[in-house]
Amino acid sequence: MSVVAGAGLVGVVKSVTSNSAVVLLMSDPSFRLGVRIAGSQVMGVLSGTGGKSYALQLLDATEDVNLGDQLIARGSEGDKPFVPGVPVGTVTWVDNATGQLTKHANVEGFVKLTSLGVVSVILSTTADDPRDSLIPPKPKATPTPTVTVTVTPSPSKS
């Protein structure tokens, strides 16, 4: 289950007892999350580094990623453990080296993990899939005009 604070994603619940839960923070080196650049379909994998920033690996090196791009969680099948659309962070550095199979960047999270107070655990989501909000709607089919020719006899002049 996703763990969030006011500004975005904090981590994921790893285990639960009757009184508490153990959360794997985004900063943990074993943390992995599928993300996308907000407003696009560009996807990548975000990894914890053990520090204050995160490592982003884009799956397609030909895609553009820019300083200031915002990332959101891509989500998991069945929304567990990650729900889609949760804000993750902002790109702060991009490696524009050519000839690589993937593109790398650094990301600063929206949530400061060193100063957390109350967090929330997302137990379920709505039936609406927020991932669809980034996909443009399918174009409506253009109606085919129907032309009907009616021959009207003209009055004859006598």
Question: Which role does the model predict for each range below?
Answer:
Residues 1-158:
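Extracytoplasmic/periplasmic terminal helices and flexible tails
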